[in-house]
Regions:
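HIT superfamily nucleotide-processing domains
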Residues: 2-129
Length: 129
């Protein structure tokens, strides 16, 4: 699998980005997983009993900035999500499960402008009437 060429894009971070600071270890987090391409950590204000984020180490502000060069990276995030969901305590498919949310842009609910995937499982507070 070919990922985005991180070696030639080492400077692609944002010094003011809270997620870039978490990746750099400047802000503490409860790490779920890390490899050379992504970092996953528990949400500080969870909406569900299991709620963590998967973020690319490369600073990509939103889905609007994705290119075909990022396809393998996004595929990696998508295939990693179910593995981490099970690891963190989600019940397996089909009776269990989890939800993936990718907010895009301010009007789409994105609060931190560094691409991130919410993975939530357990009770479903978003179904409240």
């Amino acid at each position: 699998m070919t990922f985005f060429d991180f070696e030639s894009h080492q400077a692609m971070t944002d010094a003011n980005c809270i997620f870039c600071k978490i990746i750099a270890g400047q802000i503490p987090s409860r790490k779920v997983y890390e490899d050379e391409h992504v970092f996953a950590f528990h949400d500080i204000a969870p909406w569900a009993p299991i709620h963590f984020l998967i973020i690319p180490k490369l600073h990509i502000p939103s889905m609007a900035q994705l290119t075909t060069e990022h396809a393998a990276l996004m595929g990696h995030m998508m295939t990693l999500a179910p593995k981490l969901a099970l690891q963190e305590g989600c019940n397996p498919y089909p009776d269990g499960g989890f939800r993936i949310v990718l907010n895009n842009g301010t009007e789409g609910g994105q609060e931190v402008h560094h691409l991130h995937m919410h993975v939530m499982g357990g009770s479903r507070p978003w179904l409240r009437g």
